[in-house]
Amino acid sequence: MEKEALSIAINNSKGGVGKTTISGNMAHLLSLCGYRVLLADFDSQGSNTEMLKVVNNEGKKLTRKDIDELNVFRMFIGPVNMNNYIFHTQYENLDIIPNAQTVKNVFGNGTFDERFAVEGLPEGPRKYLALYDNLAQIRARYDYIIMDGQPSINNTARITIAACDYVLSPAAADLFNVYPIRQTCEMIRFCNEQLKRNIGFLGFFLNNVYDVKAETYLQLREEYEKEGKKFFDGAGYFVDCPIRFSPAVNKSGVTRQFWFDYAKNHSVQLLNPCKDLLRLLYNELELIEKSHLNELVKNGIRSSDIEKVTGVSIKVDENKEDTHAEN
């Protein structure tokens, strides 16, 4: 049986925590590591779509009107042909389900239940699994499906979480994010208990941290560890791998470049957020296999930078074409 994609929803019911930034850069990093990645832009702002050149099989770039007519939210309420919603980007291993701020939510007026009644779709818990069923069509094509969801507690968010294998939550470096993350965990519990899913929570981490050595951050980290254990049945789920702030991150967004591209295109050392994201995915969450670190070197990332973060030595031969990871 062919291996199917691992799907991860980047979710937090609170906006402004960097969910879209993390999901886009995470998908890009995994693609640089040689994984086949699908980035599902389910955030109605469509910011990740704006970061990418979205093209069809003929190489034609999609317009905003093209994306409007697609209306990705149709896959949330019933069966669709997923081939009509997946497009290539300028990156070899990265495809996207595009979205745009002008796309109207298919639920429109009325409640979620009323819309399902109009569509003549299944009643009961099964109605939350339309996206899960649709993604089953294409799981074998990819290694990872990264989903950027909406920052809210609504049925769109529930359907997104119901479709994934794991949830990962970025949080702002303040004390106002514990409850929103708890809400995310409650949605996971709903999906597992009511929909008979088996969704795991990878945990939450602090994003956009200015100074990891500052006393205020150390106090904040201690508070999050304590609150995490208090609210999550002692499990904690706090991932002590902060993503640090970097002024260059703002520049990369303005120029519509992912972090690793910005560093490579400007011939600078890996930005702190690049190092932290690599550390999060390789060291902490183990989503990147050691053998795939070689692909980063082939994609222009310095082997010395990779070794500093991961502890893995990447041997590069003299012609710099063949690489392999060493212990």
Question: What name fits each language-model region?
Answer:
Residues 1-327:
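P-loop NTP-binding core
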